[in-house]
């Protein structure tokens, strides 16, 4: 451990690997809500946060576990398509609360092109929230529909049926053939859209009002 008069003990949350204060400061300076994406071994969650002196206030949030309980999701809780759908759900809820713009907070995740963090970002963008980003870092449509998993499952089923059963046991137990995953993603997305169709209608109405005023 460092010693001497110039040594500074890092703040507790930085020591615990929870907060990058330098990055947090830059995000707070933007004056916009932060879209935070956090990932565990089983699930992931997306929050839209407002920075306050007493602590962050959650404006809107979504957890991938909700996809299973409320919208019939049968896939994994923390893969790329789950990240996209969770970001989409959180984005609609943010719009419902009046959040039109935000900045992405990746936390201590390493920003990797096409990763789950950016899949969640793509979901929020598709919901209608404006978030500064580069198109290059977003995963493609085929990726967030998990077509790569479906193709791998189809090939594995032909090559090694036993390994296929083990690898995709959770999907199969829930009644989903992994080869049908892209279509299932669309089904769940439509279920989310149906639950929050009033948000899309209100957002469209606001857009028309702005155009008239302009």
Curated annotation (Swiss-Prot):
GO molecular function, one term: structural constituent of ribosome
Keywords: Ribonucleoprotein, Ribosomal protein, RNA-binding, rRNA-binding
SUPFAM superfamilies (UniProt xref): Translational machinery components
This protein's record includes keyword Ribosomal protein: yes
Family: Belongs to the universal ribosomal protein uL18 family.
Task performed by this protein: This is one of the proteins that bind and probably mediate the attachment of the 5S RNA into the large ribosomal subunit, where it forms part of the central protuberance.
Assembly, per entry: Part of the 50S ribosomal subunit. Contacts the 5S and 23S rRNAs.
Protein name: Large ribosomal subunit protein uL18
Lineage, opening ranks: Archaea, Thermoproteota, Thermoprotei, Desulfurococcales, Desulfurococcaceae
